[in-house]
Amino acid sequence: MTTTQKHDLFTPEPHYVPGYAGFFPQLRYQVGNTYGRTTGQLLTDPSVQKSPCSVLSPMSKPKFIEDFSQSKPPRVPCQDLTEPYIPHYTSLKPSKNFEILGQLPPLEVDAQEPPGVENIPRQILLPAGFTPDTPHPPCPPGRKGDSRDLGHPVYGEEAWKSATPVCEAPRQHQLYHCQRDEYPPPARRQQETLDVGSFQRLPQLDHPNLIQRKAISGYAGFIPRFTWVMGLNYRDGVMQAMDEFDKSQFLFRNPHCDLGEKLPGTHWPSNHIYSSQGLIPFYMGFIPAMQDNYALTFGNSTRRAYWKEWAKRNHTL
């Protein structure tokens, strides 16, 4: 049989996995060959010295010879696959001959059923109002008792209510499982009214700027007035920067002016964390009258561009 030949477009074997960024000896950046083709040439070049311990997978599949001389132990199937129960079910598990008191006739010890009858499901007539899915406490162990003491096993409760005598059942001891409700039915819960306003309330914090003072691990976003200082950790630096920013925002919203003087033109009342003069950090949209300025942050550049546009409009008016 002739093996199928690979096209020249595919990387020759052997080669390293694409995306491998480890050490590869005698590999230089070359123009015209891919990474896989270059590594393939180096691996197949006889003049290049190679280590006897190869890191590549073997080219040919190894032949495994299984030893059948020794006898193997019988295979034990998984118990979960043979047990007819639901996984993680921890409630009552009745036995094969489980019977409810007063519902099934007594078992005949001597009678033998013909083959194939045990696979036929039995139709049991249940009384009105009987719910088989009603939760019950764990069933107590079966006990032996006389059928006269427990009632007629065939007619059940009807034998107690009717005045006419019924045919007597054979005196034979039989295991009965008795169940009773030991817990009162759960009371109906009152319909709770949903408070819609609770979704709009902010949490009450001990400190007004407690959220700002917590430095999130791995956060690499913009922090106002934060500078890298030698010997100061990240958390302390963020707390100092936010304190300075809060002071500057307070002085900006409440400028100092003597009695009778007009408020300065830089007073812009705002409830946001950033002033109305500057744009949002990392905004990459169009800003009129803004060019690349040296030694100016993005916020100061946008503020300067805003004031230039504001002065230009006032001058034209």
Curated annotation (Swiss-Prot):
One of its GO terms (biological process) is flagellated sperm motility. It is found in: Cytoplasm, Cytoskeleton, Flagellum axoneme. The lineage of its organism: Eukaryota, Metazoa, Chordata, Craniata, Vertebrata. Keywords: Cell projection, Cilium, Cytoplasm, Cytoskeleton, Flagellum. The gene is CIMIP2A. It comes from Homo sapiens (Human). InterPro entries: CIMIP2A, CMI2A-C-like_dom. Belongs to the CIMIP2 family. Microtubule inner protein (MIP) part of the dynein-decorated doublet microtubules (DMTs) in flagellum axoneme. Binds to the intra-tubulin interfaces. Residues 131-153 are annotated as: Disordered. This is Ciliary microtubule inner protein 2A. Its main location: cytoplasm. One of its GO terms (cellular component) is nucleus. Microtubule inner protein component of sperm flagellar doublet microtubules. The keyword Nucleus does not apply.
